[in-house]
């Protein structure tokens, strides 16, 4: 995290406008275990697994994202001389979402119709607040949750949140960091990197991805197709991960199929 924050400082000092988007699921999981409220997951049709976010789980998730991860990032950036401001999608109605409909899923080995899941899909992004902060020389540090039209707080995926925000801000770059070198043809072989991934071949890329990587790939492809010029899925574990991604590391998503790399 410190290395990525140092990259943010370097970019800001060079005159770039940077928005940091983060999640906090891992921190929330640890807090939940500490509180005796460990995370639970839904397995829907097709085997897709997602966080079960009932009211209690949403409270824990907010503790992790807004109470632990965000303050740590803001303080780290501030210590490096970056004027960071912490926000969530709820602030200024920045990000609105549509709540997921009741659906049949398996929870704790039991199949049921889930009606109390407070998760949703992003419906709109208003970039006014982050744009105002950027114009004033601040670096926004933004995360879920989002807000429904009815005023409910909803959990949304942080990677797709980042993609939607990048599109709304007409960003030149979107760098999505992960714990692998990028999209791999063989997930067990870190040297099997897909260097260039045409966004119109999303289904093929999703077949290569597994677990959380599927969401990251989908988010990257969506941003690319919506006009973000440079979209990279890269390794967040390396030194200077953001600068490395901008210099060519990781998987770059491109619009043109003829740019496909083997």
PLM features: what roles do these ranges have?
Residues 1-262:
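C-terminal catalytic "cap/lid" subdomain
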């Amino acid at each position: 995290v410190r290395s990525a924050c140092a990259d943010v400082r370097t970019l800001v000092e060079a005159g770039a406008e940077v928005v940091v988007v983060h999640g906090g699921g891992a921190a929330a999981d640890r807090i939940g275990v500490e509180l005796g409220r460990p995370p639970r997951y839904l397995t829907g049709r097709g085997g897709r697994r997602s966080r079960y976010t009932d009211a209690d789980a949403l409270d824990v998730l907010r503790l992790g994202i807004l109470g632990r991860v965000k303050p740590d990032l803001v303080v780290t950036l501030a210590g490096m001389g970056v004027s960071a401001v912490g926000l969530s999608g709820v602030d200024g109605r920045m990000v609105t979402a549509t709540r997921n409909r009741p659906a049949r899923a398996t929870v704790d080995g039991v199949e049921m119709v889930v009606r109390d899941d407070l998760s949703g899909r992003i419906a709109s992004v208003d970039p006014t607040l982050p744009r105002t902060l950027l114009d004033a020389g601040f670096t926004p540090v933004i995360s879920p949750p989002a807000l429904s039209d009815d005023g409910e707080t909803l959990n949304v995926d942080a990677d797709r949140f980042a993609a939607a925000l990048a599109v709304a801000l007409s960003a030149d770059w979107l760098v999505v960091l992960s714990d692998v070198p990028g999209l791999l043809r063989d997930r067990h072989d870190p040297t099997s990197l897909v260097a260039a991934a045409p966004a119109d071949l999303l289904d093929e890329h999703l077949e290569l991805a597994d677990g959380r990587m599927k969401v990251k790939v989908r988010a990257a492809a969506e941003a690319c197709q919506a006009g973000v010029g440079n979209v990279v899925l890269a390794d967040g574990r390396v030194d200077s991960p953001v600068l490395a991604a901008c210099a060519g590391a990781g998987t770059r998503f491109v619009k043109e199929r003829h740019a496909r790399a083997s």
